[in-house]
Amino acid sequence: MSTIYALSTVFGKSGVAVFRISGPDALRALELLGLDIKQPRPRFVYFARLFDEQLLIDEVLVVYFASPASFTGEDVVELHSHGSIAVLRYISEKLSTLFKPAEPGEFTRRAVLNNRMDLTKAEGIIDIINSETQEQLKQASRHLSGKLAEEYNSLRDKIIKVLSYLEAYIDFPDEEIPETVLAEIQQSIVAIQCDISRYLADGKVGEKIREGFSVVIVGKPNVGKSTLFNYLAKRDLAIVTDIPGTTRDILEVRLDCHGYPVILSDTAGIQETCDAIEKMGITRALKKATEADVIVFLRDITELHLTNVRREDVANSVIERHLDRQVAALGSREHIQIDQRHVDKLIGSSDWAQEMQLNEAGVRSKNMNYPDIEERDLNLRDILDERHEEKDRSVMCHDMMQEHDPDNGECSDDVDRRFNELFTAAKKLEIPVVKVVTKGDIAPTQLSFWQDKGYICISVYKGEGMQLLLDKIFDIISSSNIEAHIITRARHRLALENALEHLRRFNTDLPIELAAEEIKLAANHIASVTGEIKLDDVLDEIFSSFCIGK
C-alpha cells in the first residue's frame, strides 16, 4: 500500500492548517521536512521548526498515530502549520517528492478497507461534514455512532439464521429433520419480509432529511411568489416587478425550517400566454410542483370572490372595493375593467352589471388625478368594446372571479383547468397543499373571508403571518419523520429492495439448493450496506463525494 498525503483543511489564509500523511512510510515525512523529531511516541504532540536550508519557514506541531490505532488503521502523521499560502505550497511540494497525493475520500476508504469502520459510519462522516441543519446532524450522528449498522446487522443476522437451517438440510440430507422446521423457516422469512417492507415504506424521509424537503411556490403572476421567496431567503434572489411573467425559470434556495432542510422553489406564474419561453417556464413550474413534498399555493387578497353572491348590492360593494384598491396601487399606468360575462354568470343579472361598471368611472377619476385619465374615464360609455381595443392596457379581472381552491373542480378558463389538474395530481400523490393569500395589509377587512376558506393570510410588507406559514410547513415535513428510519441513501433502498425480491422468490417447492441461494443473495444485499461485502463500484461511488484530505 502506498503512502498518501493531503491538506485536510481549506487551502488559503487561516490560523491553522493540517496535513495528513498515511501509510507505511508516514514517519519518513519528518525526515523529508527536516524536522528534529526522533522516534516520536504515538499520540504525543511535538513542537518543531521547519527550515529551508537556513531560512525558518514555520513553527509546526506534529502528532504520530501508530497502526492500527489510527483513523485509517495505518501509520499516520499529522502536521499542523500556520495557514499561510506560501507555507502550504512549500510543504506540499516537499511531500509530493516522496508520497502520492490522496484522492477524494481516500483516507476514509482505507479506514473501511482496514475494518476501522463500516460504510454507514463512513457515510455518517461525510453527512456530518455536509450537515446544515439540526435534523441532518442528528441523522448523521446515528450513522457515526453505529446505530444504523446495528439495524442492518440485526436484519442480516435474522437472514443468516434462516440460511443456517437451510444449509443443515443440504449438508445433512440423511438426517431426520422435523417437517415443522421448514414451516418455521417460511414463517421467519415472512417476518423478515414484513420488516423490510416497513423500512421501505418510510416516505423516503431519510433521503429527504439528507438532501432537503422540496417546497414549491405556485400561483398566478403578480400574486407575490417572488416577494415571498426573497423574504424567506433573506436576500434578493428573484427579480420582483409588477410586470406579469417576470419569473421564467425555477429559482431555488436552501432554508433551515426549524431544523429541517428545505429547498424552496420560486416558479413562473401560471397564466395563458403566447410567449414560447414563458410557456416553457409554466410547464416546468407545474412539473416541479408534482415532484414537491409541499406545494404553497398563493393568491392575491384583492382577487374578487363573487362565488355564491346573489345580492346585487353585495356584489357591487365587493367589486368597488376591489377596483378602488387596484386603481390606488396601479395609478395612471393601467386601465382597469371587469369582464361582464363572468359577472353575469355569477350574479345572474346583466342590467345592473353594466351600470355598475359605468359608475366605477367616478371611483377611478377620484383616484387618478390626471387630466388624460379623467377624460378617458368620463367617456367609458362603451367599456366592453373598449376592452377589445385596449386589450394590452387592461387588467383582466374575470379570471379572478372563480375560486381555485384545491377542492373546487369548476373551471372558467384554461388557467383554472391547469390549477385543478395540479391539485388533482397532488391529491393522488399525497402532496400537501398549503393555501396562502398574500398582501393582507392592503385589505385587512377581507382576512376573515380567506381564513374561513382555510387560507393562511400573510403580508410580506409587514412580516405578518410568516411565522404561521413556516410553522405549517414544519408541521407537514416533521410529521413524516419516522424515528426508526434506516434508509438515508438510494443505495440503501436499492439493497433492501433487492433483498426483499430474493426473499419473495424463496419457495419450499424449489430444490433446497436453489431456495437457499435466494436467501444467501438476500443476505449479501443487506451486507453490502455496511460493507461486509465490499464492492469496488460501491466504494467508488461513496468516496467520490468526500473532500480531499478526509
Curated annotation (Swiss-Prot):
Subcellular location: Cytoplasm
An example molecular function term from Gene Ontology annotations: metal ion binding
Domain (TrmE-type G) ranges: 212-478
Residues engaged in binding (6S)-5-formyl-5,6,7,8-tetrahydrofolate: R20, E78, R116, K550
Binding residues annotated for Mg(2+), in chain numbering: S226, T247
Chain sites annotated for binding K(+): N222, T241, I243, T246
Biological process annotations from GO: tRNA methylation; tRNA wobble uridine modification
Record's cofactor remark: Binds 1 potassium ion per subunit.
Major location (coarse): cytoplasm
Family annotation (Pfam families): MMR_HSR1, MnmE_helical, TrmE_N
EC number: 3.6.-.-
UniProt superkingdom: Bacteria
Keyword tags: Cytoplasm, GTP-binding, Hydrolase, Magnesium, Metal-binding, Nucleotide-binding, Potassium, tRNA processing
Binding, GTP: 222-227, 241-247, 266-269
Cofactor(s) in the UniProt record: K(+)
GO CC terms: cytoplasm
Family assignment from sequence similarity: Belongs to the TRAFAC class TrmE-Era-EngA-EngB-Septin-like GTPase superfamily. TrmE GTPase family.
Described purpose of this protein according to its UniProt entry: Exhibits a very high intrinsic GTPase hydrolysis rate. Involved in the addition of a carboxymethylaminomethyl (cmnm) group at the wobble position (U34) of certain tRNAs, forming tRNA-cmnm(5)s(2)U34.
Summary of subunit composition and partner proteins: Homodimer. Heterotetramer of two MnmE and two MnmG subunits.
Protein name: tRNA modification GTPase MnmE
Organism, as annotated: Neorickettsia sennetsu (strain ATCC VR-367 / Miyayama) (Ehrlichia sennetsu)
